[in-house]
Amino acid sequence: MNSAEAFAAIALAAVACDGSLGRDEAHALRAQLEYRSLYSSSSEADMGDLFDQLLHRLRDQGVNWLVDEALPVLTLPQQQSALAVAAHLAHADRTVTEEESAFLESLSKQMALPEGEAASILVAIEALNRDSLDA
């Protein structure tokens, strides 16, 4: 697995961890990846092939396996970004399920981030996605 596959794997795991891949989540996943330098030279067909391959692995091996394979490939800055994107994607459908919360917690613990950094990233992304009109 290369870094482009690994980063996409974490993002896909985030949207699939609750057992469903909704339309809002799929659109958010695509939007989060398409402007990043890792994917900027990828064609529609390349991206389709990448996700077909990752979805096959996800179905065969599960979310945890996908994350376990992806994390060691990512550098520390890539892990930071992957966690932020995963958290943002969990909020894409405006509801964070228990499964998504548990996934983000587990992902945070598996990353080699400095003490407290993962929690700070999650809090920041939650604040970013909060509807300020809600109490």
Regions found by a protein language model. Give the residues of each.
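Small-residue-enriched hydrophobic alpha-helices in membranes
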Residues: M1-A135
